[in-house]
Every structure is written in C-alpha cells, then in structure tokens.
C-alpha cells in the first residue's frame, strides 16, 4: 500500500484534512476535496499559495508528487463566487463576512471609500509615560482601533455609538477574523414554504417560527453627524412656522461625506430642503400624495444630491415678545414619540443602506431624522436621530403600534389569526437594582432611538446661491407664496447679477422650471443642471442662449414685470408689439390666455 499523506485544505468555512497518497493524481485528489467540502466538481478552485497562484487543475497525468505537494502542506480553497479577484473586496474585512455577503451589489461611494481606509487612531509619543526613542512604540502610543470604547468615551462630547464601519472592523477583528459573523437583517415574519404542517393559524413549527426579540440599545450608528451647509437653508424652512404657527415637514437633500471627528464616521450634509404637499396644524402633520416626488429625486440626482433624511418642526411659542419657544422634548418627557419612531422606521426601510456584507444586499439605513424643537435655553434647536435596525424590522413587519395617551411608549402587537407576532422583550432595572426582562407591552421607545449630533459649519458652504429676494418655496400657497411665472419674473427682475449661474442656482427655482405645467423643461434642462453641479458659468451661458430660455423670458414678459435685458417687456431681441401678440398670464389667477384678448378667460378679470 502506498504511503499515506495528509493534506490540509483551508476554505472560508475552516480547515479540513484530506487523506491522499503521493502517487494520487490531481483529479482524484480534487474529487476528494469536493466530497469533503460538499462542492460540485466545478464549484471551487484550489491553489498552492494564499494569493491565488499555483492553481491545481484536474489533471489525470500529474500526481501530487510531481506537483511537489508533501505531507502536511496547506492548500487554499476558494468557492467560484470568490475565486476571481475584485477591487471592491480588497479591504481588511474578513473572508467569513465576504462568504456570507452579497458581492455583486454596488455600495455608496462613501462606503467604498471608508472600507479602504486604515481607520486606526494614531497617537504621538507621550513625553511622560513613553520610555523609548522617537521611532519606538509602546502601549501608551501604539495606534488604537477605531472601535476603542475608552477613546470614544473620552472624546468631547463623549461618543455613545461607534461608526458603522468601526463596528465592521470590530466584527472582523480577533483570531477568527469574523468568519462566523454575518450582517443578517431581522425578520419578524413566519418563513414561507414550510410544508410539514398547515399554514398559520392552524400550524407552526420551530423551522418557520421567527425567534423572540430582545431589544438592546444599538452600539453603532450608520450616520454620525448631520450638518446643514448654512443657516439660510434651515431659516427658510422655519419661516413657515414663524408666519403661520403651524408645524411643517420637509425632505433633506444632500450628500454623504466623511465625518473626521469620529473614526470612520459618516456625515449627512444637507444642501436643500424640499417641502412636499402637506396639511399642518399647531399640533399635527398630514402628508399628502406628491405627484412630483420622482421628478424631484431625478433632478436632485443630476445635481449630485440625494434624499438623506426628513425634518419636521415641533415648536410652540412661549413668549412672542422675547421670541422664545417651549422646551418640551427632554429626558422627563420624550425625544421622539412612538408615532415618530414608526414614521422614521418606515422611511429608513424605504431607503436601505446598500451593503455587500449582508446576504440580502442591504443592512440598516443612512436615512436620518431631524427635529426643529425648543432647547433648554428656549431657543430653536435642531436634534438628529435614527431608529435602530430592530425598530426597522418591527415597523417593516407591522409589529409595532403607538400608544395613544403616552407618546413615549410603543406597543408590540399580539398574535392574531391573520398575523403571528414574535414575543418582544426589553431589559430594565427594578426598584431593588436587579436586571429584569419585561414584555414590550408597553415599550419605552428610548430602546429604539439613536441620537445623532446636528451642527452648522463655522465656514458656511453654498451648493446653491443665496439671494436677498429668493424664489418662493414649493407648496406654500397658504402663505400666498406661489410658484408661477409672475413670481419668476419678479425674482429675475430683483436679481440682476451679471453672473447668470448665480441667478439660476436656486434649488426651488430649478424644480419649478422642470415641474411647471405651462413650460416644463424636464427634457432640456440637463445642461443647466450640469452647469449648476460643476459651477460652470460657460455651460450656463450656453443653455441661456437656447430656445427654451427665450420662451421662458417671453412668458415672464407677459405678466407685466420689466426684466433686465428685455426691451419694453419684449423677448430677447423683441419689442412691445411682439409681447402683445404672445400668450399672457392673468395677474389674478395666473391662467395663460390667448394673445389679443383683454380679459382673462378663466376669471373674467381685465388684463391690466
């Protein structure tokens, strides 16, 4: 009998020992490997070196002896999905997480950037504690990992939640390199396809039954900071409450960037706030269907922006003479109500965080919640939040309800004949100081909330131009602020900057040019949006010479507002006679009338 040898084969699932002989062919050996690891014949590749060089092919003429494979050698197995090199996978994350993940999804640019960063916290030599030379390192100056809790707790202010990418580094650290860890999304639903019994409510088994959920305070957050580019963005949003006293809602449009104050942190920079159709009162908000939502997202994308969160006001005036507001959200009441947590969870489920380390291709969300409310000094403060991944799962699977009389409490639904709901628990401290487990009926929503710092920069940033007479914001008809060609003509007449790009760089103006019903420019505005995105005045001037802008100026001239550069209300190069032969907008109802008429066809009021 030929001398037996043992070959070790390392795979993403661990190391196994294969018994073989020196004269055994490579093809026979690979069949043993496939059987041992449970692969099909072509479902894997085996290499002599870890860097995927020296592949062992299924040859019937080459023996292990000819391949110089000896007793005790270590070979490396890679499944087919991991066999090819990928630039996205060249990070410090573990092979284990990659094996469980979805390698074909495209992550956000900020995630791709941070995954390639070192992330370690470098410290200089301590002159009092370090006893070595300038080139040496010791425990007092060696670089720290980005998830070091002691370092985060001693920051000013202390950081309660590590960044998401620091959390990934923590999972992939240690001896096993995260081999047995997967970023799996929580499911509160019964698994479908179980044929061993009747469907719920007539039957259930341990295979299809979702596990009970014990709520824990999440140790990480997907976004570490919310920053408004300048005060004007926030002040214009607050103007609605200042003028009406009613609460207001808006979507935050901006971009995700690196937050350098926290290791591997992410910041949501807000460049504009879009206000959808809504009905607001002093203590409630109702969102209406928005037919322009997809167009707004498309325009924002062409401007290099995306929807990064939502904002709402909760302001009650305390002293109108001093301009103070009531301080109502604090540790003695609540920071987010249960209804607001459910709304935030719904928004986060609609905007998932693309993640290649999750089998589903997504994990958590970077969608943030901002609240304009009263602070301890009775001035308007902006607070930022997210809800945990556990809350997202409870909201997605319709397991969480708000409490009517206690906004600080939620309620986990009970199972019914239509829906099975797993038990939800949370841990608390009783009056004797003992840790006890409580059923989440009711549930303090503080277990679901993650707070995020909200800031303004010392040096303001301006993605869009700031004007003393800005263009009206959409959906503010209750204030008498309407977006029409009369307001456009007024805006253009008051903003006489010689730089056309500065005049046209207004988020709400660009939305009006695309979404107005008289002259929508959705198919011809791409060049202008590119000019605004890149701050290119030449591109803006090129678009200004187009027929579309000439038509816009012609429509503005019919509403009776003198535009700079136009002669006697005529279009470019036109005259007053040309204006009278064009369509004109009624100053009372904005209806576009046919040329030659003296009264509006809609409201019957005179033209002048």
Swiss-Prot record:
<dbReference type="GO" id="GO:0051117">
    <property type="term" value="F:ATPase binding"/>
</dbReference>
<comment type="similarity">
    <text>Belongs to the NPL4 family.</text>
</comment>
<comment type="subunit">
    <text>Heterodimer with UFD1. The heterodimer binds ubiquitinated proteins. The heterodimer binds to VCP and inhibits Golgi membrane fusion. Interacts with ZFAND2B; probably through VCP.</text>
</comment>
<dbReference type="GO" id="GO:0032480">
    <property type="term" value="P:negative regulation of type I interferon production"/>
</dbReference>
<dbReference type="GO" id="GO:0034098">
    <property type="term" value="C:VCP-NPL4-UFD1 AAA ATPase complex"/>
</dbReference>
<dbReference type="InterPro" id="IPR007717">
    <property type="entry name" value="NPL4_C"/>
</dbReference>
<keyword id="KW-0256">Endoplasmic reticulum</keyword>
<dbReference type="InterPro" id="IPR024682">
    <property type="entry name" value="Npl4_Ub-like_dom"/>
</dbReference>
<dbReference type="GO" id="GO:0008270">
    <property type="term" value="F:zinc ion binding"/>
</dbReference>
<dbReference type="GO" id="GO:0030970">
    <property type="term" value="P:retrograde protein transport, ER to cytosol"/>
</dbReference>
<keyword id="KW-0479">Metal-binding</keyword>
<keyword id="KW-0862">Zinc</keyword>
<dbReference type="Pfam" id="PF05021">
    <property type="entry name" value="NPL4"/>
</dbReference>
<keyword id="KW-0863">Zinc-finger</keyword>
<dbReference type="Pfam" id="PF11543">
    <property type="entry name" value="UN_NPL4"/>
</dbReference>
<dbReference type="GO" id="GO:0005829">
    <property type="term" value="C:cytosol"/>
</dbReference>
<keyword id="KW-0007">Acetylation</keyword>
<dbReference type="Pfam" id="PF05020">
    <property type="entry name" value="zf-NPL4"/>
</dbReference>
<feature type="domain" description="MPN">
    <location>
        <begin position="226"/>
        <end position="363"/>
    </location>
</feature>
<dbReference type="InterPro" id="IPR007716">
    <property type="entry name" value="NPL4_Zn-bd_put"/>
</dbReference>
<dbReference type="GO" id="GO:0006511">
    <property type="term" value="P:ubiquitin-dependent protein catabolic process"/>
</dbReference>
<dbReference type="InterPro" id="IPR001876">
    <property type="entry name" value="Znf_RanBP2"/>
</dbReference>
<dbReference type="GO" id="GO:0007030">
    <property type="term" value="P:Golgi organization"/>
</dbReference>
<feature type="modified residue" description="N-acetylalanine">
    <location>
        <position position="2"/>
    </location>
</feature>
<comment type="function">
    <text>The ternary complex containing UFD1, VCP and NPLOC4 binds ubiquitinated proteins and is necessary for the export of misfolded proteins from the ER to the cytoplasm, where they are degraded by the proteasome. The NPLOC4-UFD1-VCP complex regulates spindle disassembly at the end of mitosis and is necessary for the formation of a closed nuclear envelope. Acts as a negative regulator of type I interferon production via the complex formed with VCP and UFD1, which binds to RIGI and recruits RNF125 to promote ubiquitination and degradation of RIGI.</text>
</comment>
<dbReference type="GO" id="GO:0005634">
    <property type="term" value="C:nucleus"/>
</dbReference>
<dbReference type="InterPro" id="IPR037518">
    <property type="entry name" value="MPN"/>
</dbReference>
<comment type="pathway">
    <text>Protein degradation; proteasomal ubiquitin-dependent pathway.</text>
</comment>
<dbReference type="InterPro" id="IPR036443">
    <property type="entry name" value="Znf_RanBP2_sf"/>
</dbReference>
<feature type="modified residue" description="N6-acetyllysine">
    <location>
        <position position="179"/>
    </location>
</feature>
<feature type="zinc finger region" description="RanBP2-type">
    <location>
        <begin position="580"/>
        <end position="608"/>
    </location>
</feature>
<dbReference type="GO" id="GO:0044877">
    <property type="term" value="F:protein-containing complex binding"/>
</dbReference>
<dbReference type="GO" id="GO:0043130">
    <property type="term" value="F:ubiquitin binding"/>
</dbReference>
<keyword id="KW-0963">Cytoplasm</keyword>
<keyword id="KW-0539">Nucleus</keyword>
<dbReference type="GO" id="GO:0039536">
    <property type="term" value="P:negative regulation of RIG-I signaling pathway"/>
</dbReference>
<dbReference type="GO" id="GO:0043161">
    <property type="term" value="P:proteasome-mediated ubiquitin-dependent protein catabolic process"/>
</dbReference>
<dbReference type="GO" id="GO:0031625">
    <property type="term" value="F:ubiquitin protein ligase binding"/>
</dbReference>
<protein>
    <recommendedName>
        <fullName>Nuclear protein localization protein 4 homolog</fullName>
    </recommendedName>
</protein>
<dbReference type="InterPro" id="IPR016563">
    <property type="entry name" value="Npl4"/>
</dbReference>
<dbReference type="InterPro" id="IPR029071">
    <property type="entry name" value="Ubiquitin-like_domsf"/>
</dbReference>
<keyword id="KW-0143">Chaperone</keyword>
């Amino acid at each position: 009998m030929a001398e037996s040898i043992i070959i070790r084969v390392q795979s993403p699932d661990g190391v196994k020992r294969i018994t073989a002989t020196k004269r055994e062919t490579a093809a026979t050996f690979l069949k043993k490997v496939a059987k041992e690891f449970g692969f099909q014949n072509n479902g894997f590749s085996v290499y002599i070196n870890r860097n995927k060089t020296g592949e062992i092919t299924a040859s019937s003429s080459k023996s292990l002896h000819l391949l110089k494979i000896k007793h005790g050698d270590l070979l490396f197995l890679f499944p087919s999905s991991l066999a090819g090199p990928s630039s996205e996978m060249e990070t410090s994350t573990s092979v284990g997480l990659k094996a469980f993940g979805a390698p074909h999804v495209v992550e956000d640019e900020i995630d791709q950037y941070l995954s390639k960063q070192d992330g370690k916290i470098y410290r200089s030599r301590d002159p009092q504690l370090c006893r070595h030379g300038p080139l040496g390192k010791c425990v007092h100056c060696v670089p720290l990992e980005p998830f070091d809790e002691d370092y985060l707790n001693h920051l000013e202010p202390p950081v309660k939640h590590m960044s998401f990418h620091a959390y990934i580094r923590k999972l992939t650290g240690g001896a096993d390199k995260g081999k047995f860890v997967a970023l799996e999304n929580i499911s509160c639903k019964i698994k479908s396809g179980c044929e061993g019994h009747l469907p719920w409510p007539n039957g259930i088994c341990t295979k299809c039954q979702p596990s009970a959920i014990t709520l824990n305070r999440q140790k990480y957050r997907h976004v570490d900071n919310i920053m408004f580019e300048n005060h004007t963005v926030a002040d214009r949003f607050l103007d609605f409450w200042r003028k009406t006293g009613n609460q207001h809602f808006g979507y935050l449009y901006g971009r995700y960037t690196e937050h350098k104050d926290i290791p591997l942190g992410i910041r949501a920079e807000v460049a504009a706030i879009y206000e959808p159709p809504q009905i607001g009162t002093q203590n409630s908000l109702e969102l209406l269907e928005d037919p322009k939502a997809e167009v707004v997202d498309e325009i924002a994308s062409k401007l290099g922006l995306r929807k990064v969160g939502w904002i709402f006001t909760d302001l009650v005036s305390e002293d109108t003479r001093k301009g103070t507001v009531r301080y109502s959200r604090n540790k003695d009441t609540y920071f987010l109500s249960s209804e607001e947590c459910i709304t935030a969870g719904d928004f986060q489920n609609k905007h998932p965080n693309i993640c290649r380390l999750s089998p589903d291709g997504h994990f958590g969300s970077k969608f943030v919640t901002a609240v304009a409310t009263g602070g301890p000094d009775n001035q308007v403060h902006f607070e930022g939040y997210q809800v945990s991944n556990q809350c997202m799962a409870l909201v997605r699977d319709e397991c969480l309800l708000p409490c009517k009389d206690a906004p600080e409490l939620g309620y986990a639904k009970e199972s019914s004949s239509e829906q099975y709901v797993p038990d939800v628990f949370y841990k608390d401290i009783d009056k004797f100081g003992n840790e006890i487990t409580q059923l989440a009926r009711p549930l303090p929503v503080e277990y679901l909330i993650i707070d995020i710092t909200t800031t303004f920069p010392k040096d303001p940033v301006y993605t869009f131009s700031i004007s003393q007479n800005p263009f009206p914001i959409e959906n503010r008809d209750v204030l008498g602020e309407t977006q029409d060609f009369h307001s456009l003509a007024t805006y253009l007449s008051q903003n006489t900057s010689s730089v056309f790009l500065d005049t046209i760089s207004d988020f709400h103006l660009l939305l009006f040019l695309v979404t107005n019903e008289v002259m929508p420019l959705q198919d011809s505005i791409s060049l202008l949006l590119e000019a605004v995105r890149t701050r290119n005045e030449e591109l803006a001037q090129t678009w200004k010479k187009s027929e579309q802008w000439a038509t816009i100026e012609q429509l503005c001239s019919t509403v009776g507002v003198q535009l700079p550069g136009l002669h006697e209300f005529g279009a470019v190069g036109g005259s007053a006679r040309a204006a009278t032969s064009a369509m004109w907008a009624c100053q009372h109802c904005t209806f576009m009338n046919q040329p030659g008429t003296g009264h509006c066809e809609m409201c019957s009021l005179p033209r002048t």
